[in-house]
Design a protein with these regions (language model features):
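Surface-exposed beta-loop interaction hotspot
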Residues: 25-73
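Acidic, serine/threonine-rich low-complexity disordered tracts
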Residues: 1-30, 68-181
Length: 181
């Protein structure tokens, strides 16, 4: 991981009530974007973007070094999921990034004023800088809607081998709902 390197690839698959869309960004000399969508206006689109930080990659950057050069970023490509669900143009948008320490946590805020959108990521202030929660707020027509998530438990396991019903009790230890309940 070099100081100036970016994620090699980011993808998003979004299913809406009336169709689905898939988006992929490949990091080459420029960012190569491919969009495949159910919607005619955005179906099978390809575009090139100048190198820019992607919100999809900041989650990893925060885990590696939360006090990196992230705070110097002035424009960023919002999450691919957000762009698809809100039908926004794929480009880097102005962003104000701030960090503050609260007890043993670090809260990083990404404020996209031109999009009326804010993302807050709360993580441990010490290594391994685990992400504890996040919150996304979007204002539309004067109403703010907030989505949030909080880690309840964690476990290290070979999850790719634990995909049979006999492993369902592991969901309890992670405080996840059981299937069919």
């Amino acid at each position: 991981l070099g100081k100036k390197s970016h994620a090699m690839k980011a993808t998003a698959s979004v299913h809406e009530w009336c169709g689905q869309a898939f988006m992929q960004v490949n990091n080459r000399e420029d960012l190569e974007v491919k969009i495949h969508s159910y919607f005619e206006s955005t179906a099978d689109k390809e575009l090139q973007l100048n190198q820019a930080l992607m919100e999809n990659e900041v989650w990893n950057l925060l885990r590696i070094n939360p006090e990196s050069e992230l705070l110097n970023v002035e424009k960023m490509i919002p999450s691919l999921e957000y762009l698809r669900l809100r039908h926004r143009e794929t480009k880097a948008y102005p962003v104000d990034i701030t960090q503050k320490s609260v007890k043993d946590t670090l809260i990083t805020t990404f404020d996209y004023t031109s999009l009326d959108r804010t993302l807050k990521i709360k993580q441990e202030a010490k290594f391994p800088y685990e992400i504890l929660s996040w919150e996304e707020s979007i204002t539309d027509n004067g109403k703010t809607k907030t989505t949030s998530a909080k880690r309840l438990e964690s476990m290290r396991s070979a999850y790719w081998n634990q995909n049979k019903p006999e492993f369902s009790p592991l969901r309890d230890s992670l405080q996840l709902p059981q299937y069919g309940k």
